[in-house]
Every structure is written in structure tokens, then in C-alpha cells.
From Swiss-Prot:
GO terms for molecular function: G protein-coupled receptor activity; nuclear steroid receptor activity; olfactory receptor activity; signaling receptor activity. One of its GO terms (biological process) is cellular response to fatty acid. This is Olfactory receptor 51E2. GO terms for cellular component: early endosome membrane; membrane; plasma membrane. It is a multi-pass membrane protein. It comes from Mus musculus (Mouse). Pfam families: 7tm_4 (PF13853). It comes from the Eukaryota. In brain, expressed in medulla oblongata by cells close to the fourth ventricle, in the area postrema, the nucleus tractus solitarius. Expressed in olfactory epithelium and vomeronasal organ. Expressed in kidney by large renal vessels, renal afferent arterioles, and extrarenal vascular beds. In small resistance vessels the expression is restricted to cells of the juxtaglomerular afferent arteriole, which mediate renin secretion. Also detected in small blood vessels in a variety of tissues including heart, diaphragm, skeletal muscle, and skin.
Amino acid sequence: MSSCNFTHATFLLIGIPGLEEAHFWFGFPLLSMYAVALFGNCIVVFIVRTERSLHAPMYLFLCMLAAIDLALSTSTMPKILALFWFDSREITFDACLAQMFFIHTLSAIESTILLAMAFDRYVAICHPLRHAAVLNNTVTVQIGMVALVRGSLFFFPLPLLIKRLAFCHSNVLSHSYCVHQDVMKLAYTDTLPNVVYGLTAILLVMGVDVMFISLSYFLIIRTVLQLPSKSERAKAFGTCVSHISVVLAFYVPLIGLSVVHRFGNSLDPIVHVLMGDVYLLLPPVINPIIYGAKTKQIRTRVLAMFKISCDKDIEAGGNT
């Protein structure tokens, strides 16, 4: 390994290249989205935990999804806001590796949970009489543990692969946070093992999940089209709309970001960074909105909470 290795030094985050002077203003919409993500996902976790009628597999998966979104957005947004508002550009090597690990691992866990939710829809629609036996709450928790272990095992090697590299030419990351592809590009030594393993891990996790989610919905559509009445078909499809929306919100930006990272060298770096920032916030922001709008129990509890809060404010105002 080259003697110019500075693995125990710091990296410098650029943020949005070429738009450094506008960082202060970019921080406000990002903070707003982060606040919505925190509020929405905390509400989902609270309602699912406290509402006994929601202690069913699909909603337990939704609770897991909300917890993952909270962790994923919190792993990056505080540092991004510190960078944009206080010019806090430095991030230590170990902190960068930790952030990289959490981003990739949590994304893999979320992908697995989305696959589990697709399986839940498949069993509920294609084998409704077996749903309670196949997917009970114990099995749901076990699937959550498998998702955690699977994501951790596949992406734990990434920081180790980065640690073996030597960095000489630059410690400047043209991004707002640390991801494997960008840190790897700064290395002075051969990065082929990193490239091969990174691509393999993504294909074995995200690729496999997308394939089985697609298969699940192929079987669901085939079953639904065989239902005798139009109302039955509409009702069956209606139970899948929320999950399909969440899947698209997660995978479409992820696939677009992966394509840009690997084949978009001619694109302006601004595009890379903005897509990366939006990708980390889009699912956490819209997931609770989608499920809150489509799930009567969640919608009713949220409205009831606001009503109670407003009534207390009115009473307090009347007593003064």
C-alpha cells in the first residue's frame, strides 16, 4: 500500500458543486422535508404501536418501514444542514465510513421490507384463506430480523474494502454525504474489488428484491383479472395501490441514481448531488403521507390527535 495513505484524516464535503453560495437557501426546503419525514414517520410508528387493530402483518411492516426511514434520513440530514448553514465541511474518515454503512445498509433493509410487503399482498389476494397461517405477527417480526441481518451482512464489507485503499490526490468529496461510489473514486490504489463487490451486493439485494416484487404483482394481477365482478377487481387492486406507490417512490429514484453514478459521467455534478439528496428524503417524506391517506385507522387517529390538541388550545384560551 502506498505511504501516502491518509485513512485517519478527514474528508471535505463540497455540498452542491458550483452552488456553494446558495447552500444557505437550499437548507430551508431540505429542513422542511426532514421535519415532515420526522413528524410523519413518528406518527406512523406511534399509531401502529398503540392501535391494537393495526397489529397485523401489513401494518407491522409499515411500522418497520417508518422506523427505517427515520434512521435513514437522520443518518445524513443533520450533517447536510450543518454543511449548508454553518460550512461544516469536515467529516472524519471513520464518521464517513459509518455514514456510508448506514446509508447502504438501511436502504437494503428497506428494500427487503418492501419485498415482504409485496409477499403479504400476494398471500392476501392469491391465497386469502391461508394468510393468517402463513403471515402471523411472529413470522412478521422474524422477517424484520432477517431484513436487518441481510442488509448488515451484505454491506458490512464496504467500509472494510474502503479501509484497504490508499488516498493521495484529494480528500474532497463532491457530495453532501458519504457513499461508497464517491469515496472509492478518491482512492489512489486499485478499486476493482470495491467495484465488483459493490455491484454484486446491489444486484443480490435490490436486483433480487425487484425481481420478486415484480413476480408477486404479476401473480396478483393474474388472480385479480380472474375475479368475476368489476367491483371485486377494483377492491383487490385498491389494497395494493399504497404499496405500489411506495415501491415506485423507493426504486425509481434509486435506479436513476445508480444509472447516473455509473454511466452519467458527462452530466453536471450538480445533478448527481441533487438527485442523491432528494433520494434520501423522498421516500421518508411521502411514505407516511401515502399510507396515512389510504389507511382509515391511521387517518382517523391523526385527525383525532389534531382535534384533541385544538380543543385543549381552545379551552386554555377560554380560561385565560
